[in-house]
Swiss-Prot record:
Residues 287-314, 346-377 form a coiled coil. Belongs to the actin family. ARP5 subfamily. GO terms for biological process: chromatin remodeling; DNA recombination; DNA repair; regulation of DNA-templated transcription. Residues 368-387 are annotated as: Disordered. It comes from the Eukaryota. Component of the chromatin remodeling Ino80 complex. GO terms for cellular component: nucleus. PANTHER family: ACTIN. Proposed core component of the chromatin remodeling Ino80 complex which is involved in transcriptional regulation, DNA replication and probably DNA repair. This is Actin-related protein 5. It comes from Aedes aegypti (Yellowfever mosquito). It holds the Pfam family Actin. The keyword Acetylation does not apply. The keyword Transcription regulation applies. The gene is Arp5.
Amino acid sequence: MSLFDIEDIKVKPDIVCTYPDPTVPPDAAIVIDNGSYHCRAGWAGKDVPSLVFKNVLAKPRKDRSKKDTSEVVVPTVQIGNDITNIEAVRFQLRTQFDRNVVTHLHVQEQIFDYLFGRLGINADGCVPHPVLLTECVANPNYSRMLMSELMFECYGIPGIVYAVDGLLSYRMNGGQDSGLIVSCGYQATHVIPVLNGRMVEDKVRRINLGGFNMINFMFRLLQLKYPVHVNAITLSRAETMIHNYCSFAYDYTESLRNWALLEFYEQNVIKIQLPYNQNVSAPTLTAEQRLEKRKELSRRLAEINLRKREEKLAEDKVLLTRMLAAEDTLDDEDNVGFTLHEFSVKNVDEYRKMIVTLRERIAKTTQKMNSQQTNNQPEEKPLQLLQPPPNMTIEEWVIETRRKRDEILDKKQIRKQRKQDLAKRRTAAAQERMRIISHLAKKEKGVDDFGMRDEDWDVYKSISREGDSDSDAENEKLIECEEILKQHDSTFVEPVVAPGNIAEFHQLHIGVERIRVPEILFQPSMIGVQEAGLTGTIDYVLKLFPKEDQVKLVGNVMLTGGCANIRGFKERLSRELQAILPFQSVYNLMVAGSPSLDAWRGASQFANSQEFKQSLITRQLYDECGGEYFKEHTASNFYYPTPSQVSSALNDTFN
């Protein structure tokens, strides 16, 4: 059992890099790994990217209250690491991706502006460097065409090369001519077969699951488990928990059985301490202090009542003076109706009766106020102190009361400990319970007289899991003892709630969720996705090839992508491969050296190769052949021309 403080992701805004970079050639290419989770950008030939940031932007909504002002206010757009608190702008986040395909080019343009600006490129209206840009497997021609149009028309780049991130990572890790790539991304997971140095694109398969689904699953599980802490459980914190504490189970079914055991749970559960404000408890008041406090409250209440009486008395006197002054008009028939209406009475008799009532009320209130002034102290009921029996002194009575209280607390603690012991399998209490049960079961069948004797109740209590419960009489006796000690024992301290209990209330227990969340990659049905898991997809892809090619593929299986960082992935997939391959098959499984970063590193190496120069789509080719023109290479998608009917329909739609 381990306790950890919650870790909130803290990012620092990116600085503007020096341009031109003295460590790279003047014509060096810009390498951009445009992932749906992180964007990594830097110069070709370097080992690490210059920029790594979340591939999102936050655009605040316009303030509608200022729509009538003549001054145009443009909301500030935050991009990448400029978003220091992503949860504060969660509902304002925008991304250029629809799953893993770039579809929102206006968002992509703003992110590229941020990227080139942070790289320090300050050329006049253009980016004078070729670009290597990653794209998803089987990226649609139309999406690539819009990206080329953005790059050439908006940024004026001299050339661009498109490559698949999984193939670049495979290349970085010394990929052989044949192998099987399992690329686990943020939005999707791809199984990519490679034969003779090229991807077999028509046999690639995709699972619509990735890191995003794991984060969302953990987020919903914890909110369902701890509804009282629903505001403290955020997507960012769920993401951190997956990175730090989750792992793939080698045998998921067996792991579930282990987590059902209390001992295993207590040894392996992760406790996450949420932030909370600890209220400082007020000091315990003595009997004299409580009495003084009651007197003070009574005095304040008396002052409030006196003030109300004075206000009411003044109102009554003013009303009586007005009525006496208007009494002479009652004999005038012309004014009597107006006078009665003014004082809301029906006739003259009711008017005179109201005057008598006011005089009596004024006299009574004045008399009560005079009596209070003579005796300012309100009458207090004496504090009823509990007294000892006639045959005991107070000191003896306090000692005896303390002893009784300790006995009651000891009994309650013994019952609590016994319940905990019975919950475990190998404790002495649990073994004694099983011995008694087995002894009772050995008795011959006949007349069941268990319970006829008083001793049977003791046997029942000894084998009952619940044990004795705290009786009401016992609790009342405990309260009485504590009240006596409060009044007569100056050393007695009233028990208060320990701060540790408050801290435990603000803890999250990450138990079976540690293996349950990553398991969705192998069992998508756990979150309602009707697709095959990773094992079934790999098995399906392998069966698309003849046996001799299957041997080549399983001889070099590589895991890459952010999800490959989760512990136990290699061991679990190795077990699954052993189950689906023929008996005594030989296979080799490896994890990329840096699953998250190797795609950019492979792109950095590729951008320095001769193949990059041969695969470059230049501005001249773009102008001559159009935005759909594409050059294939060993780390790229295959080019399939868009049918003419579809092309004409797209042109009619967007022209």
